[in-house]
């Protein structure tokens, strides 16, 4: 399955919430009718079944993190094997992806841009180049931008945007050095309250 390359705002409208797929610090609802689904009949909101509600939540989270269906299912299987709450485990596994950590540190304006930085070998973990977006970052790992990539205008622009956002407490970033430390795996309370991971657990438990 190929990645979605179409309009990003359309995906946010489909889910009825900002998926943070566009760069910038302003919420997108000022220019995008989030309450209306895309398409000719977008104004008509069908009443979702229990399954439909669970599916929409899974699609929403999958799109937020930019993960394909097969990858997402594998993350769920891994989360189910771990001790504790499966839904929380799932979100924590997604948060430890290298492309997501690069985004959280502000080196990429979006997760998609952060994924591209990783794929193009612009990112190092503990001094070694890593070009696998799904690479799992561990507590106390140091993530940095390669020296030859530090002049990229998009990275500088992303850092300027990130400076206006609320900084995640689980990462520590030195913007001047373009380097950050992943201090810990975030707790559930650190993450968006708009995600209902229990719906995803119910979906995959069927």
Curated annotation (Swiss-Prot):
Superkingdom classification of source: Bacteria
GO molecular-function term, one example from the UniProt record: structural constituent of ribosome
Classification via SMART domains: Ribosomal_S4, S4
Entry keyword rRNA-binding: yes
Domain S4 RNA-binding, residue spans: 96-156
SUPFAM superfamilies in the cross-refs: Alpha-L RNA-binding motif
GO CC terms, sorted: small ribosomal subunit
PROSITE patterns to which the protein is assigned, alphabetical: RIBOSOMAL_S4, S4
Keyword Ribonucleoprotein recorded: yes
Coiled-coil residue spans: none
Keyword terms, alphabetized: Ribonucleoprotein, Ribosomal protein, RNA-binding, rRNA-binding
One GO process term, biological-process aspect: translation
Role of this protein: One of the primary rRNA binding proteins, it binds directly to 16S rRNA where it nucleates assembly of the body of the 30S subunit. With S5 and S12 plays an important role in translational accuracy.
PANTHER family: 30S 40S RIBOSOMAL PROTEIN, SMALL RIBOSOMAL SUBUNIT PROTEIN US4M
Protein family (similarity comment): Belongs to the universal ribosomal protein uS4 family.
Summary of subunit composition and partner proteins: Part of the 30S ribosomal subunit. Contacts protein S5. The interaction surface between S4 and S5 is involved in control of translational fidelity.
Protein known as: Small ribosomal subunit protein uS4
UniProt organism field: Shewanella sp. (strain W3-18-1)
Gene: rpsD
């Amino acid at each position: 399955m190929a990645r979605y390359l179409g309009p990003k705002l359309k995906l946010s409208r489909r889910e009825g919430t900002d998926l943070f797929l566009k760069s910038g610090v302003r919420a997108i609802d000022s220019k995008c009718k989030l309450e209306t689904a895309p398409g000719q009949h977008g104004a008509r909101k069908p009443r979702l079944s229990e399954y439909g509600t669970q599916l929409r939540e899974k699609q929403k989270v999958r799109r937020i993190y930019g993960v394909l269906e097969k990858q997402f299912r594998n993350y769920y299987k891994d989360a189910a094997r771990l001790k504790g709450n499966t839904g929380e485990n799932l979100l924590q596994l997604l948060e430890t992806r290298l492309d997501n950590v690069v985004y959280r540190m502000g080196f990429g304006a979006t997760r998609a841009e952060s994924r591209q930085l990783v794929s193009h070998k612009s990112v190092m973990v503990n001094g070694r180049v890593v070009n696998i977006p799904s690479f799992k970052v561990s507590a106390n790992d140091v993530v940095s931008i390669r020296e030859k990539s530090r002049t990229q205008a998009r990275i500088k622009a992303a850092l300027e945007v990130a400076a206006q956002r609320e900084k995640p407490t689980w990462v520590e970033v030195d913007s001047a050095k373009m380097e950050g430390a992943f201090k810990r795996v975030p707790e559930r309370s650190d993450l968006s309250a708009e995600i209902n991971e229990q719906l995803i657990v119910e979906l995959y438990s069927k």
